[in-house]
Amino acid sequence: MSEYSIFTSESVSEGHPDKIADQISDAVLDAIIAEDKHARVACETLVKTGVAIVAGEVTTSAWVDLEQLVRDVIVDIGYNSSEVGFDGATCGIINIIGKQSVDIAQGVDRTKPEDQGAGDQGLMFGYASNETDVLMPAPIRFSHALVERQAEARKNGLLPWLRPDAKSQVTCRYENGQVVGIDAVVLSTQHNPDVKQSDLREAVMELIIKHSLPAELLHKDTQYHINPTGQFVIGGPVGDCGLTGRKIIVDTYGGMARHGGGAFSGKDPSKVDRSAAYAGRYVAKNIVAAGLADRCEIQVSYAIGVAQPTSISLNTFGTGKLGDDKIIALVREHFDLRPYAITRMLDLLHPMYRATAAYGHFGRTPYEMTVGADTFTAFTWEKTDKADALRAAAGL
């Protein structure tokens, strides 16, 4: 039986201030890694009324027109006029990026690439569950679907009075580990001042909520809270300061799994906060896809400058078809979780990261991208290409 009878997760749109910051940080990473695959990047962004501040540490041979890059991201999200409270074309851009510490570099860089040390100490978690088709928890999956649809309806002109900032929240009811109903839906969306609240609520219900959520899970007692405070005209960086790395639960499993605390956006793959969390998802998803367990959470930890993980632990919450200790042995046999090996296994040295910075890093569909002369697959950590080998090794 599921550990939870009711569980709630939330998501935010690409126009949420914290997500603007995440997307800018990852756009900077992409621009650098497109020219210098082995660059070291740690980029943080702050956005507030009329200004974007970009800071961090970078070691690279690449040159990036950072000001234009930041403006392009902001405008692309939808902040293109003072009428919506933020204008990427005219806002101030402050660049305070410096160089990476040589003390860190000496702990990471090695003559033999496979001996590359972790960029920092830390612990990372990966998770998967068979409750949805993408092996993600349903509450975060559905929450992402709502704000993705909000952005789609805004950008394609279906609901042209929508503005970029939005938040969603979904409460799911479980029986025996599977979702049997949605008990509550919250969707708050920024909008133009001239739209009537009654029209907004009807349109959001019919064209966003009902379009995004499985009809069979909505029932007569489902609670709907659409812009529950009423008017939501002032939003984005005018309403709230946005910072990189403040939506780490939205980025991962919606609280259904534990989190080591490290954010992803703006960090190159040498930072295990990001790459090892991606590897953890890859491992957990393949374990569930192989049928070794219905749910799986894995923890990996590292010491700065050391290649081998300091620990690997795993929990299948009583759903494993064999013991957790035996599954850990299979993980060690089939997955090399040293930092360089993760980068190679998941092919992470490509400019794929801005695409991860909104609507979740996990539960996405791998797809081919081309940037300049570089063609690669994004979201490789969502592949289940190890499932057959794991199943065979487990004797299932």
Curated annotation (Swiss-Prot):
PANTHER family xrefs: S-ADENOSYLMETHIONINE SYNTHETASE (PTHR11964)
Domain of life the protein comes from: Bacteria
Protein function: Catalyzes the formation of S-adenosylmethionine (AdoMet) from methionine and ATP. The overall synthetic reaction is composed of two sequential steps, AdoMet formation and the subsequent tripolyphosphate hydrolysis which occurs prior to release of AdoMet from the enzyme.
Coiled coil, from the record: none
Gene source species: Stutzerimonas stutzeri (strain A1501)
Pfam families: S-AdoMet_synt_C, S-AdoMet_synt_M, S-AdoMet_synt_N
Annotated residues for binding of Mg(2+): D18
Annotated residues for binding of ATP: H16, D165, A166, K167, D240, R246, K247, A263, K267
UniProt cofactor note: Binds 2 divalent ions per subunit.
EC number: 2.5.1.6
Annotated binding of K(+), by residue: E44
Binding-site list for L-methionine: E57, Q100, D240, K271
Cofactor(s) named in the record: Mg(2+); K(+)
Pathway participation: Amino-acid biosynthesis; S-adenosyl-L-methionine biosynthesis; S-adenosyl-L-methionine from L-methionine: step 1/1
Location of the region described as Flexible loop in the Swiss-Prot/TrEMBL record: 100-110
Protein's recorded name: S-adenosylmethionine synthase
Catalytic reaction list: L-methionine + ATP + H2O = S-adenosyl-L-methionine + phosphate + diphosphate
Keyword Cytoplasm belongs to the record: yes
Molecular functions (GO terms): ATP binding; magnesium ion binding; methionine adenosyltransferase activity
Subunit structure and binding partners: Homotetramer; dimer of dimers.
Family: Belongs to the AdoMet synthase family.
